Amino acid sequence: MRKFNCIDLFAGLGGLSTGAVMAGHNVIWAGNHWDTAVEYHQLNHPNTEHVCQDLQQANFYQLPSYDCLLASPACQGHSLGRGRDLARHEVSRSTAWAVVEALEAGSPPLFEVENVEKFTDWNLFKAWKYAIESLGYSLSINLLDAADYGVPQNRLRNFIIGTKSKKPLPLKLEKQAPVTARSVIDLDSGNWSPIKTKRRSPKTLARIERGRRELKTDTFLIPYYSSGSGLTGRSLDRPIGTLTTVDRYGIVRGDEMRMLTVDEMRKFMSFPDDTKLPPQHKIATKLLGNAVPPLLQKQILEYVAAAA
């Protein structure tokens, strides 16, 4: 199997990097504008060179020599939950165009871009794709659900693979049996509280009652927003739904409930047990919710390395 020297643009907690290392590759450089993300990426990848800056202003000609570019550009402008502050999101971190600049400067034989499902609906996606193809790359666009590949979470994302070849390299990964939320959640841990309190939202109480009726159980997951299972509940005998950058899922057990612990979120994202995370629940949740599941990334790069 070929061994890649990788760089990681927009490196947060390091799902792309961690998966690459799990697949036997090196991550030699990583960058992000957020100092906390860089701090924890560095703690988890101490042998990687790190920079903290807006990557739209980076000089990619100064990067060390590499042969695989990994990138997860900002997804806020493409996701369904982007809200009304798109302008703030667009200036808060570099966009997908930084990938084009890096590819033009480094001309690696391989790259991988991860983003949300709606990324391909972006008004400038065709122009972005054309710009990359003009640099000599063939692109395959692969919509993958992490739950199909051993990750205990339904997480649908685009993985775009670019190669300097005449034909694209589509990802044909072997699917696996689903891993359930029950296998991750520790019902004996966490801070449980009574369901019926004065502070509990009537909408939350209604969702819990609907969950009891629909699932015919007193122990289940309750999303705090969304549609579908967000209106009722979610069985522990299926993968959890998509984790985001804020607390999204609670666990109902009889007449009490609690939110997911950071350690449970780490497991749902398939990060290794020795992953270093911030002690603050809110910051750890944000880093995990922005990440790529390393277990899926490992399989992607194993497949690409064998096929490239």
Where are these regions (language model features)?
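Conserved SAM-binding strand-loop segment of SAM-dependent methyltransferases
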Residues: 47-54
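A short, Lys/Arg-enriched amphipathic alpha-helix followed by its capping loop at the start of a domain
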Residues: 2, 19-26, 44
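Class I S-adenosyl-L-methionine
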Residues: 58-68, 75-235, 242
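Conserved SAM-binding loop
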Residues: 41
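C-terminal target-recognition/interaction regions appended to catalytic cores
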Residues: 202-308
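Class I SAM-dependent methyltransferase "Motif I" SAM/SAH-binding loop
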Residues: 9-13
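Conserved SAM/SAH-binding beta-strand->alpha-helix loop
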Residues: 34-35
